[in-house]
Regions:
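Glycine-rich cofactor-pocket loops
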Residues: 135, 139-161, 271-287, 320-327, ...
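A short, charged helix-loop
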Residues: 217-233
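A helix-coil-helix interface module used to build multimeric assemblies
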Residues: 1-198, 204-219, 280-281, 291-295, ...
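Active/binding-pocket-proximal capping segment
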Residues: 271, 394-401
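Long, amphipathic alpha-helical stalk/connector segments used for oligomerization, subunit docking
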Residues: 302-388, 394
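Short beta-alpha connecting loops at secondary-structure transitions
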Residues: 19-23, 68-70, 278-298, 320-335, ...
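Short amphipathic alpha-helical segments with heptad-repeat character
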Residues: 117-128, 135, 161, 165-168, ...
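A conserved active-site cap/scaffold subdomain adjacent to cofactor or substrate pockets
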Residues: 234-269, 278-339
């Protein structure tokens, strides 16, 4: 029996690792790590805190007494003070020095920063694995000619692998963005109620050097390079917007990829994985719907819209802080991460099992290639003594006739036959067939793929080689 609502991001889409990042255990054990780091740093800077007190805090770092905290919060209506109380129940010797000099945002904001960095690192790992799978795909099909499309109308041929580099290029931009944001994240530190560190001035008898050192010591203990040099009670909520923008960027890239896959699947050129017993439609048993791509698109829409939340929060903060950020942050930030986690799992799953139908691709290409070969045909006819302007007009007329045969009469493209039968060109059918080699029209597609993989992708994969080899498990 399931009586209450469950978030689909948790039960259907996100992986276990990301759910652990945003779990209550991770959040509140990080609060306790921060209290330990604060106590250790204050002791090292001369405050009267004992090794015994710190040892007691460490002993209970991970066994969170949620029942005590929950009961206390019903009384005091304050989550941080409820957990200070609960920790003190477990650590009676250290109770008096927990949270010394700090305000709620010391644990709340610093923990948010730590957890967001953990989430970004997991997203980065999955992103790199998607890039790696796309690289294999691009290399495999780097020389396979296919119709390109502009305005979803047939255009000069490209290769299947070259098209995949376009998907990768957007992910490379996302990779660069996520690396920058991860590297630029700092802790809030220990700034006090309005960011002035006034409480620590009292604790350390006005010793500015010790107070500055306290911030850096906490950052070091928590694995950060430093803290933001100035703040109000909270870190600037623009940081949250920067983080969600990275996630929205990945969502945009993934959505674009699925647009192409869905259109290619309609053309029967490329197909996402379809399992042996998978059902496409409850009514139409023959259906092979691109449901993975559609799910990515759906989740991506959510993430892109979710990125508005931290923008609104940051823009409506007052002075040193207001609390109208809190409820929104608790929802929008975890859900953005959970959704992107699901997107990347699906992306990896699709690329790993994507099917390419080479004969269908060739058939579609050859149906359009006579039109695309006309410039070369015209040049060859000029070499045989023809007039360029006259040939151009004749090709225009014959192309319109061939187009009518295809669209109105349902016939094959007979443009080459029409040209061969026209005395204006002085070209035989055999000479015209020489213009029908698709590789003549793909330009540097193959070489561009090789250069891109060697110069852009391989260095990224080499830098992240320890993170490679992931597989994606799709729940439904």
């Amino acid at each position: 029996m399931k009586e209450f609502y469950e978030n689909p991001l948790c039960v259907r889409y996100s992986g276990d690792a990301m759910k652990r990042v945003f779990s209550a255990d991770n959040k509140f054990s990080t609060w306790r790590k921060l209290w330990i780091a604060l106590a250790e740093s204050e002791k090292e800077l001369g405050l009267n805190i004992t090794d015994e007190q710190i040892a007691e805090l460490k002993e209970h770092q991970n066994d969170i007494n949620y029942d005590v905290a929950k009961a206390r919060e019903k009384e005091v209506r304050h989550d941080v003070m409820s957990h200070v109380y609960a920790y003190g129940v477990q650590c009676p010797k250290a109770k008096g020095i927990i949270h010394l000099g700090a305000t709620s945002c010391y644990v709340g904001d610093n923990t948010d920063m730590i957890i967001m960095r953990e989430g970004l690192q997991l997203v980065k790992k999955k992103l790199v694995n998607v890039i790696a799978e796309l690289a294999k795909f691009a290399d495999r099909y780097k020389a396979l000619p296919t119709l390109a499309f502009t305005h979803f109308q047939p255009a000069q041929p490209t290769t299947v692998g070259k098209r995949a580099t376009l998907w990768m290029m957007e992910l490379v931009q996302d990779y660069e963005d996520i690396c920058y944001v991860i590297d630029s994240l700092k802790l809030l530190g220990s700034k006090g109620t309005t960011g002035t560190q006034a409480s620590f001035m009292e604790l350390f008898d006005g010793d500015h050097a010790k107070i500055r050192k306290l911030d850096q010591m906490i950052a070091d203990k928590m694995g950060f390079a430093g803290v933001y040099p100035v703040s109000g009670q909270t870190y600037s909520r623009k940081v949250d917007s920067r983080v969600l923008n990275v996630l929205a960027g990945i969502a945009m890239s993934a959505h674009k990829f699925t647009n192409d896959v869905r259109l290619l699947q309609h053309l029967k050129e490329v197909e996402e994985p379809f399992e042996k017993h998978q059902i496409g439609s409850s009514a139409m048993a023959y259906k092979r719907n691109p449901m993975r791509s559609e799910r990515i698109a759906s989740l991506a829409d959510y993430v892109i819209s979710d990125a508005m939340n931290p923008m609104l929060v940051a823009s409506t903060q007052w002075f040193e802080r207001t609390l109208d950020d809190s409820a929104n942050k608790r929802i929008s930030i975890p859900e953005g991460f959970l959704a992107v986690d699901g997107i990347l799992d699906l992306y990896l799953n699709i690329v790993d099992g994507m099917v390419v139908y080479e004969k269908v691709i060739h058939k579609h290409l050859m149906a359009e290639l006579p039109f695309m070969a006309t410039e070369n045909i015209m040049m060859d006819a000029v070499k045989e003594g023809g007039d360029r302007q006259e040939l151009h007009e004749k090709i225009r007329q014959l192309s319109m006739e061939a187009g009518r045969n295809v669209k109105v009469n349902g016939l094959d493209n007979n443009l080459l036959d029409l040209i061969a039968a026209d005395d204006t060109f002085h070209l035989t059918k055999e000479q015209l067939q020489q213009c029908m080699n698709p590789e003549r029209y793909t330009g540097r597609s193959k070489e561009q793929v090789e250069d891109f993989l060697a110069e852009v992708i391989n260095p990224i994969l080499a830098k992240n080689k320890e993170d490679l080899g992931m597989t994606a498990e799709i729940n439904v």
